[in-house]
A protein has these predicted regions:
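Helical hydrophobic small-molecule/effector-binding pocket
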Residues: 61-83, 97-98, 108, 146
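Amphipathic alpha-helical packing segments from all-alpha helical-bundle domains
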Residues: 89-117, 126-133
């Protein structure tokens, strides 16, 4: 996403397929965007988890923090939020959409992998994953009113506490 409006017809042309084929595959522009964002998010968080190495709560925190910082600095995502705010929030934060459920599942898989390696948490992995994703959504996308939008440092502190680490 280079900061331009996403044109499904142009994407279909670039892929050498008919617009009708794109429509059959994804039905709507919103679903196409959701699939792209979800796939990128799943891949990126897995890559970052692998990159930080280590095990346990600190490894999870470092992976989540790296992911959050990338999102906070993603120009294409910022452009989408600025130009199509309602659509972007619906895509990114709706439990009925594509992105949020898949990101919760991706975070849950990371937590469960750490649990198999000995990490213990007071919360069930699905609940912890949901809380981590929803907090990131609030801090990164839609809490400018509370003055926390883009504040990845405070987000890290809260995620640390959820993971059982000292938030300081």
């Amino acid at each position: 996403m280079a900061g331009e409006r996403i044109d499904v017809q142009a994407i279909a042309r670039e892929l050498g397929i008919a617009r009708a084929t794109m429509h059959r595959w994804f039905r709507t522009r919103e679903l196409l965007l959701g699939e792209v964002l979800a796939e990128l998010g799943e891949q990126r968080i897995a890559i970052l988890r692998e990159r930080v190495g280590g095990h346990g709560a600190l490894a999870l925190l470092d992976a989540f923090d790296a992911f959050n910082r990338e999102l906070a600095g993603a120009e294409g995502l910022r452009a989408l939020l600025a130009s199509e705010h309602e659509l972007a929030l619906r895509l990114l934060t709706s439990s009925a959409g594509v992105v949020q459920p898949r990101m919760v599942a991706a975070v849950q898989r990371l937590i469960e992998a750490e649990q198999r390696a000995g990490f213990e948490t007071a919360l069930a992995p699905d609940l912890l994953a949901y809380a981590i994703v929803r907090l990131a959504e609030a801090f990164l996308y839609n809490d400018a009113v509370a003055g926390v939008k883009g504040d990845t440092q405070r987000l890290r502190q809260i995620e640390a506490a959820l993971l059982g680490l000292d938030p300081a």
